[in-house]
Each structure stands twice: as C-alpha cells, then as structure tokens.
Amino acid sequence: MDMNQYLDVFIDESKEHLQTCNEKLLLLEKDPTDLQLVHDIFRAAHTLKGMSATMGYTDLAHLTHLLENVLDAIRNGDMEVTSDWLDILFEALDHLETMVQSIIDGGDGKRDISEVSAKLDVNGAHAESAASAEPAEAQSSASDWEYDEFERTVIQEAEEQGFKRYEIKISLNENCMLKAVRVYMVFEKLNEVGEVAKTIPSAEVLETEDFGTDFQVCFLTHQSAEDIEQLINGVSEIEHVEVIQGAPLTSAEKPEESKQEDSPAAAVPAKQEKQKQPAKNDEQAKHSAGGSKTIRVNIDRLDSLMNLFEELVIDRGRLEQIAKELEHNELTETVERMTRISGDLQSIILNMRMVPVETVFNRFPRMIRQLQKELNKKIELSIIGAETELDRTVIDEIGDPLVHLIRNSIDHGIEAPETRLQKGKPESGKVVLKAYHSGNHVFIEVEDDGAGLNRKKILEKALERGVITEKEAETLEDNQIYELIFAPGFSTADQISDISGRGVGLDVVKNKLESLGGSVSVKSAEGQGSLFSIQLPLTLSIISVLLIKLEEETFAIPISSIIETAVIDRKDILQTHDREVIDFRGHIVPVVYLKEEFKIEDTRKDAEQLHIIVVKKGDKPTAFVVDSFIGQQEVVLKSLGDYLTNVFAISGATILGDGEVALIIDCNALII
C-alpha cells in the first residue's frame, strides 16, 4: 500500500494531537489531580503513536509509546504529577514536534531521542513492565474482559450518559499482509461514531502485528450493533465481525475498596471533577458520537474557485448596470435573483478559507511557560478574541512575527519580579494578546505592563547607527521615535542591553507583515508598558461597500466599517480642543473631511447640509463628511499594483458595472 496518499492527513492530524497534548499539559500543571486531562493526553498520544507506526515513522512511534507509558502510570495512581516530570513531558513534545516538522519538510522524521527516552524510561519503567505483561494476560483469557479502576470509571460514566458498551470480535483474512494498517482503519471508522475504550491484545501488540488474525475491541457508542457491524465490514480484508452488547457495569462489580485504599487518592478527585461537569461531557460525547463530516481541500483549489467567482461578480455588476439602463422588469428580476444566489455562494466560499486565530494563539501559553523558567519572571497571559477569523494563507504566516513580539515583551519589556516590586507594580507581569475585526482588516495587539520604551536611548542608538540625522532627531515626535525600533539598523545583538524594552530584529517582523499587505505600529509609555498593533487584511477579495461621491469621483467604503449614515446641518458641528466634532447619540465623535484628506478641491463649502458616514475602528468612532451616497454594492477588491503600494488611506480599487474605477478607502488609516 502506498502510504504517501495518507501523508497530508497524517501531518494535519499529528499537529492537532500535539497541540492537544500541549494545551492539556498546561492545564494539568494547574490542576495535577484532574485525571480527565491525563486521559485526554493519553488518547492524543495513543492515536499519534498508532498513526506513526502505521506510516512507518518508528522514532515517533517509540517516543509516543514511552510517553503513553508514563501517562498510564499516572492515571493508574503509580506516579504523581510534578513540575520536574512535566518538564520532561514538554521536552518529549518538543522532540515530537521537531520530528513532525521534519516530515513536513520532506525528511524521514528521525531524530536522536536517546536522552529524552532515558528520562521517560526512568519515570515509566514500572509502567513499561506492567504494559508488557498485559498482552500475555489478555491473550490467555481473550474472552474475559477485565477492566482496571480507571477504565471502569470511564465506562460507567459513559453508560450513565446513554452510551452502549459493545464487545467486538474481529477476524482478519488469513492472507492479510498489513494487519496493523487494517486495525488502524477499523479504529478510524469506530472513532467517527464513538470511542474505543480497550483492546485485546493491547494496542502495542496490534501495532507490531504480534498477533494472529483475531482481535477484540471494547467500544462505547450510541449506535446499534447492526450499524457497527456494517461500519467495520466496510474495511477491506475483514473476514468476520461479531458485535455483542455488554451488560452495564454496576458498582457491585467494582474491585474491593481495599484496592482503592492502597492506590493514591488522586483517582478520586478525577472522578469527582468529571461528575461536576456532566453537561459538558455529555455535549462532547454527543458531538463525538455524531461524527461531524469534514473533507480536506487543497488551498490552491480554493484560490482557483475564488478567482472564478471574482470574474462572476464583475459580470454580475455589469448585468446590474445593463438592467438598470434598459429598465426591463424580467431582466431586473433575474439579475436580482442571481445576486441573491451568488451572494450566498460568496459567503460559503469565503468561510471555507477562514480560520480562527486561536490556531496561532494556542502555541503561546506553552512558550510563555518556558520563558518564565528561563528568565525567572512571573507572567500572566490574557488572550482576547481568539475566535476572530482570518484567511488561512495569512494565518500560516503570522506565527513567527507574533512569537517575536511576545518574546520581546517578556524578555525585554517585563521587569524581574524584584524590580517590579520596587516600582510598586504587581510581582507578575501582564501580557495581553488581543484580536478583533475592523472593516476589512483584522487587528492583533500585543500589550505588556513592563518598562516601556526608553525614548532617550532609542534616539542615541538611532544617531549612532545613522538611522536618522541630528537635525531630524530634533523634529521627531515620540511616536515617530518609537517607530525607529523597526529600522534595520536596530537588528543587532547588543541592542538587548542598550535599549530598555525592545530592539532585536523587529525589522524582520515589519517586513514580514508588510509582505502580507499588513503593517505594525507601536505605542509606549516609559515605565508603564508598550502596545504593538498589527493590522492585517482579511484578504477577502470580494467585499460589500457603500459607494459615495467626492465631487465627480466615486469612492467605496467597506460596509463592515460603517456604523450609520446620516444627513446633518452644518450648525450641528461643534468645536473642541482645536477639532471639529459632532454629538452622535450621546457620544462626542471627531469629524474628518474626506476631500481635505485626499486633497480634492471643495466646491460645496457653503452647503447647509452635510452627508456623514460614522465608521469605527475597534471602539473608536469617526464621522466622515462626503458629498453624497450612491448605494451599496458587492465589489471585487483589486490591488493598486507594485507602483502604488503606499497610497495614504487607500486599500485598493474596484471596477464598477459601468467600467468606472472606484478607490476603496481604508477607514482605519483615517480614524484618530
């Protein structure tokens, strides 16, 4: 069998299982008595081990096997969760991630894991011996199912939630060449509709193919016996399937209480914890049993689909214009129907490309844990807006810039605990990672309450490196000085000690974000902290806009940025702090004249009434003054090309139905 056809699936699922292990281990560090977390990590490691063995990645399979032994020892009460032991587990995960990355890069996934294997063997030797003894015992009484305390607890709670327990006997064809592959395929099928609780022989024996043609599975599901049998028979080279529904496990069947007294008390809190959350577990169980159906699609195919749809939108706009000119009722109705249908199609296509930023954010708690240990600092990380969605192609690229900014916040921004106490700050530094939509952009902010940027030292270093001249230095405002840290001249190692707060390689961050069509800016208050703000395009090439007029020119404003449109009297505009504002629903909102911003001659200065559009960036509103509103329309966002990359407050252009080109306004650049 050619395993290359499964490689993409293996890589995607391996990354998901490793992420699960990382997240659950961080939670386990906070609550070492929660055995449900141990069980979740065990399941992820077990699945990864089976996949790795099937694909032939022996180092991956071996290391996850050792990981599994230790986790099994914990859930059986033979080991306790300690900080040192968690460090070893995290180290093992680092090796696993490196091996998976090697496979992604076209390598063989091999790595020297002797050192970490020795650490895991020391901690899990007794678990290994117990695991190795299990197959012989299981095979000697293959028809008698015996469950340990943890397995019994899991099964009983599943039965209380309405699950059925099936004991399934499966026979493979005598001529089956890849028994482990067939077993893996059976498990994949079963895991779509329930959960495999136990196997005879053990999973390790099944993976090494050290068994005959028969194996047994204890399976928990809502499905009927007939459905399960049909599901398994869908796998090739299955000779026979026998599905028997087991009688519910009762408390009378539990081992004697004396056994529980001999084992650590950690097993009891795990059960109590799970009883506290029946609704959550039940919801998860139903979701698992339901088996949501997904399909993996190459991103290039989605790009091609989007390109074709863009052409459809352009033609649709042209048809709308023709229907308007001809004033033909049937044509108008047909175009309106096509508009509605294509609008639904557009939403589906765009949503297919969108991924929540939590796929990137999830790596940072683990990174911060490691940095705390290395730097002897205490950090509290807050993540806000992880559900914010961004195009997949952008998501794949923003990880490294964010890692760089967060490392800078912790390494050079947050002070040591004793220094913070001397300054009257809490001992633990705070880092806030926030994401939110604004118009056709996503903003990601990294904020800390550390030392902030040292204005004087930044200026000194900028002059020393020749980034600016002394004459320029005299005229720079604070925010312009802070922006100097993104200059290439600052990306040298000695900047760590010379500039209080930031300075290493931030030009790389800026270049990367600009290559994605985004930007980065910084605000800081010395002694109070810094805020780095990343602006990224949603890369939604088809957007809904409001067309407006400025003199004879047509412009477009993204609907997603607009709060409201209105017509007001000129006398309603107030003057405060050298700025013009309006009272908008009880809030003071600054006024921006778009014709002034774009240097368009104003021939209507004496107009008594003004058309305004109230837009927002995050929670900041601003009122744009325009000449008139034309109407709402779906348009294709086009780049201005390489020659017009830095046009102020313009994010792109579009071709309207009548052939006119309209510039699309970047509201975020105009909001104060």
UniProtKB/Swiss-Prot annotation:
Domain HPt, first and last residues per copy: 1-103
GO cellular component: cytoplasm; membrane
MF terms (GO), sorted A to Z: ATP binding; phosphorelay sensor kinase activity
Keywords for the protein's UniProt record, in alphabetical order: ATP-binding, Chemotaxis, Kinase, Membrane, Nucleotide-binding, Phosphoprotein, Transferase, Two-component regulatory system
Stretch list, region Disordered: 250-292
Modification sites for Phosphohistidine: H46
Location(s), subcellular: Membrane
PROSITE patterns referenced in this protein's UniProt entry, alphabetically: CHEW, HIS_KIN, HPT
A biological process from GO: chemotaxis
The protein's enzyme class: transferase
A Pfam match: HATPase_c
EC number: 2.7.13.3
Domain CheW-like: 542-672
Domain Histidine kinase: 290-540
Function summary: Involved in the transmission of sensory signals from the chemoreceptors to the flagellar motors. CheA is autophosphorylated; it can transfer its phosphate group to CheB, CheY or CheV.
The protein, known as: Chemotaxis protein CheA
Gene: cheA
